[in-house]
Regions:
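Short, charged/polar N-terminal "headpieces" of proteins
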Residues: 1-61, 129-143
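Short alpha-helical segments used as structural interaction elements across diverse proteins
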Residues: 46-48, 79-81, 101, 122-123
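Negatively charged, Asp/Glu-rich surface segments that serve as flexible interaction/assembly modules
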Residues: 53-93
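C-terminal charged interaction modules
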Residues: 92-143
């Protein structure tokens, strides 16, 4: 069994890692996000909720006759749910604003570059084991 432990990722994904944030200019800020990985319970629950919601969204979209309006509606809902999944993987942050679901969603919507970083980081299991920075922008580093 001990040999199998080398492959276990869930505990590290649930523990999370602090990732420093950089401003859009590339300058380092004093802020950070604590991110959970794709193997975390939070990610699993959020993606299950998203899959269920997307079924309802497709049914609702079917009622929209205009093809372009239907596309815009579905695209908006997909983006909203993507951010919900990403926000579930933010367990803490350094901002004075409380780290609530609503605040995380507002932040990700207003700062899509941060949403991209979160999406890239949480999917790279190596980063939860302190193994490099593959997939991160060069201005990002892992604590």
């Amino acid at each position: 069994m001990d040999e199998m432990n080398e492959f276990f990722t869930r505990d590290k994904a649930n523990e999370g890692v602090e990732v420093p944030l950089y401003l859009p200019t590339g300058a380092k800020s004093k802020h950070w996000l604590k991110l959970l990985g794709v193997d975390s319970g939070a990610y699993a629950l959020a993606t299950a909720r998203m899959r269920q919601a997307l079924q309802g969204i497709q049914a609702e979209a079917g009622k929209i006759e205009d093809k372009e309006a239907r596309f815009v509606f579905v695209n908006g809902k997909q983006e909203e749910w993507k951010n919900r999944v990403l926000s579930a993987c933010i367990s803490a942050w350094s901002f004075e604003t409380e780290c609530t679901e609503a605040e995380k969603l507002k932040f990700l919507e207003a700062a899509p570059q941060i949403a991209n970083i979160v999406d890239t980081f949480i999917a790279d299991r190596r980063l939860f084991f302190g193994m490099g920075q593959a997939g991160l922008k060069t201005s990002q580093e892992v604590k």
